[in-house]
Amino acid sequence: MSIITMVWLMKVFVFVTLLSLVFVITESAPESALITKLPGFEGTFPSKHYSGYVTIDKEHGKNLWYYFIESEKNPSKDPVVLWLNGGPGCSSMDGFVYEHGPFNFELPKKNNSLPLLHLNPYSWSKVSNIIYLDSPVGVGFSYSNNKSDYITGDIKTAVDSHAFLLKWFQMFPEFQSNPFFISGESYAGVYVPTLASEVVIGNKNGVKPALNFKGYLVGNGVADPKFDGNAFVPFAHGMGLISDELFENVTKACKGNFYEIEGLECEEQYTKVNDDTNQLNIYNILEPCYHGTSLSAFDIRSLPSSLLQLGKTEKRLPIRKRMFGRAWPVRAPVHPGIVPSWSQLLADVTVPCIDDRVATAWLNDPEIRKAIHTKEESEIGRWELCSGKLSFYHDAGSMIDFHRNLTLSGYRALIYSGDHDMCVPFTGSEAWTKSLGYKVIDEWRAWISNDQVAGYTQGYANNLTFLTIKGAGHTVPEYKPREALDFYSRFLEGSKI
């Protein structure tokens, strides 16, 4: 080979290399979505933050809003995790503010001041890239110019979220090869497996970009009407909240069926169970309740508008209060049809045990909304923890077959439960995971965090793990942040929990 030829080849190599570098630089996260500062936080973010809208239907002006945090560890290699709060209708910024986001929020010392933000040592962004998505449209900062889009359900939500993911990974192509997981809690027990199934079908059908989907996590999630409905009474008895005598009476009167309360004697005994547990915090029976003083004009404005309208159930108020929760309903949503919201259930009664003042104040501040690239309040309204805009239909049925199909297809699943949650008790999740009939490959045992027993776990064939977190409530990382980060990290790594 002549020297001239070698020089020419070298020039071609350099040109191609430079061109590829330019391609990598240009085909990356949109700089317009970068968050450079947040009022209330002093210092430097430990990793990059992005937020903004993804339009999934231009004709309708249908836009889903996200907040994305790169991993503080190794963003180019660490998994990408989508986080979904439940409801249906609750913003995933609930998880950002109160559970596993990058900041801890300190209440301001002065009225009308913004909360102070401190770095959260147990943020899930320590070990993963994480997307907080307001879904479905009409929730949080997500909106549509066509109000008919606020009439939706399980299947449409899964289709829309899949459309979001495809466009998001096109906007952030550098993460397309990273392992991808879907996670969520409460009614996201429906969102997660239905969306996961959409992703799997899309990949099989050659939809691009292909998502490197590996598995999913569900925390205290609804799954099936019978298993969820029958979980409460055994939980209350096991926790010592009702007497042996009452447990025997209600079991006999209802013939062990607490999913459908039938007959006067069954209803009377079941009401006694509710009377004994009615004053407890349903999200964590060890915690006190936050009680609103009254529905003053200010209180009404601070609550989701959905709380001010509905109430269509024949169940007595104590039963209604137990059935439905912050990331809400337990039994009602697993029946086919419209899912009632808090306002439908409680009428003029305040939501029990919930204090969302920090998130509401922070996310409705004009400077914060500007910093995180949301539409102004004058355009899309106030941010609400749980939206009243939706007419939401449960149309996906039981989640049991979704879980079976996903795990038999080789996808990893972690079903975790705070063991003091009375909203979606661990007894139901334990029962339905067992009902799949998979071989036990890791016998029931304690799992350890910080040299202490953090809960119990049982592993099954086909990549399924059931896990409890000792002392945690409905929103596990809110109560046990260190332990939550531990099991989350181990699961993503594929390590034994």
UniProtKB/Swiss-Prot annotation:
Family annotation (Pfam families): Peptidase_S10
Domain of life, source organism: Eukaryota
Keywords carried by this UniProt record: Carboxypeptidase, Disulfide bond, Glycoprotein, Hydrolase, Protease, Secreted, Signal
InterPro entries from the UniProt entry: AB_hydrolase_fold, Peptidase_S10, Ser_caboxypep_his_AS, Ser_caboxypep_ser_AS
Placement of sequence motif Microbody targeting signal: 495-497
EC number, as in UniProt: 3.4.16.-
PROSITE patterns, sorted: CARBOXYPEPT_SER_HIS, CARBOXYPEPT_SER_SER
Disulphides: C90-C386, C254-C266, C289-C353
GO molecular function: serine-type carboxypeptidase activity
Active site: S186, D421, H474
Signal sequence coordinates: 1-29
GO BP field: proteolysis
Expression by tissue: Ubiquitous.
Glycosylation sites: N111, N146, N249, N405, N463
Subcellular location(s) of the protein: Secreted
Biological role: Probable carboxypeptidase.
Family: Belongs to the peptidase S10 family.
Name of the protein this chain belongs to: Serine carboxypeptidase-like 20
Organism, as annotated: Arabidopsis thaliana
